[in-house]
């Protein structure tokens, strides 16, 4: 019997559920470039409502959502402040600089992804022709699976606005942040979502990660900003025709898969707990659905290869990253833990040619 694969590389690997596929097949369609695909319009209205914004724009990818947002906020030659390990700066191909002529100013982040308020204030350039004009602060929530504290988001966004900066949120996994915040506060996840997004002028939300849709992201913000982003999307090749097929999956996910993200968080904690105490491992458990593991003595590649042989997939660069999602269950997590334990119990854990993938995705 073939063992079921436990794919913990990313929450992007999920497949559409049968109900989601049915919603896609039944979706009314039009031509979204002409603006008359009813399912795309319904999705845009729904995510704008959930985030408390005037409008939203459906995009193929989160990278494009972030880039269109930056290009809508900034003029050519402007600068945006961003964490040195933030996705928009490190993992999106340098698009802001290459395609938007926007200069990033990367700033040091602590172990929780926070940029100190002092560093933020000092990085804002004076109004002088020698400097790029600092016009935007970009934050990310969640960051490496960690939820940004509301107190920090409030202080950072207030500081930015006091200096005339707009504030953008890379909210690829903001639904995870909202669900975790709701669990801590005993409140509704969608109410927490609006609390988070209310602090930002714009927010990108990914549908193809924990929510489980096959494709898509949305940029949400003021109507005038979304109109600028629409022009940028066209220029970047993001206009799609009968994209209601994809929007239907995202709309289904918004209506059915938000609350269930809590199950992914429970599985991540189950994984972290199971890996605790293994000699040679240092577990950095997160608030939500991502667990990082540092592997001692340079054995990360060998561990990755061992896991692949046992039908467990992960990614790694410095240590390994495991991401839980709707296609993983408790049995799969327990198998992953047992596989890691077998590796460290074995003497055959030497060098390996397994490729370490750079992530995060």
Region spans (language model):
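Conserved PLP-enzyme active-site core in the AAT-like
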Residues: 2-297, 301-328, 336-361
